[in-house]
A protein has these predicted regions:
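Small/polar/charged residue-enriched interaction surfaces, especially the RNA/DNA-contacting tracks
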Residues: 1-251
Length: 251
């Protein structure tokens, strides 16, 4: 990636197009020397050592995101965990990820309401999910078979593409319950706070038979978010310069 300290942006490169750029401008040997030495960054190499301009480099750039305060000129070799992107390099959130989050909220809701199963929950065996969700009895010989899960009645599409203007880099910071924080040499590409992301939710009532409706799912999500916040999030120090409170219900 190329970090522009003046613009506070990070540009991710198309590797093939980048090497084409080097070959076309007879910069391969110079790049080999750059790779052999310690330190340095691609921005300085491309624009100062090679003398390239933005128009020449642009074809090698896949996309560009805001680096905010996650990067600085002295620490430009941080690892970056990139966001999920499709074949056209558009950021999106898989529907399966959202369904997994909703599944957790619904399981929490079921545990709170159906206390007859509480004695079956322990640290070694975990939560007997089949007792709560595997109620369709389509494969009575194997209850753990996913075909029996009532979650089949909930379908969530992948999100619509997220504009790169709504993406940003965030610096990973570990926070302890005693208030101490420790910055890690790692950044993550994230969706900027306040961004609305759209999915299509389908509830197949031929399977659900009224067990879950949109309102009941939203109530379960809100209840689990409150539990998560009270039980865990409030025990830790707020992120530095955070614009949203920890534990906020993002769904």
């Amino acid at each position: 990636y190329v970090f522009n300290n003046r613009k506070q942006t990070v540009a991710f490169l198309n590797e093939q197009a980048f090497f084409d750029l080097l070959i076309q401008n007879d910069l391969v040997e110079l790049f080999e020397g750059y790779c052999m030495r310690q330190g340095g960054d691609l921005y300085t190499f491309l624009y100062k050592e090679c003398g390239l301009n933005a128009a020449q480099v642009k074809p090698a750039i896949l996309y560009e995101v805001d680096a905010s305060n996650a990067m600085d000129a002295e620490h430009t070799l941080k690892d970056i965990d990139c966001f999920m992107r499709d074949a056209k390099q558009r950021a999106y959130i898989p529907g399966s990820s959202v369904k997994g989050a909703i599944r957790t909220a619904l399981l929490f809701d079921a545990i709170q309401k159906e206390r007859t199963h509480h004695d079956l929950i322990d640290d070694k065996r975990g939560i007997p999910e089949a007792d709560y969700f595997h109620t369709l009895n389509l494969n009575p010989k194997k209850r753990d078979d996913a075909v029996n899960s009532i979650m089949r009645g909930i379908q969530i599409s992948d999100s619509l593409p997220i504009d790169d203007r709504n993406m940003m880099l965030t610096l990973k910071t570990d926070s302890a319950v005693n208030g101490q924080t420790h910055a890690i040499n790692l950044c993550r590409e994230c969706v900027a706070p306040g961004t609305r992301i759209r999915f299509a939710l389908t509830l197949d009532q031929s399977i659900l038979k009224g067990k879950w409706m949109v309102n009941s799912i939203l109530e379960a999500i809100a209840a689990f978010a409150d539990y998560q916040n009270q039980t865990y999030a409030t025990r830790f120090t707020q992120p530095r310069e955070s614009v949203q409170s920890a534990g906020r219900n993002l769904l």
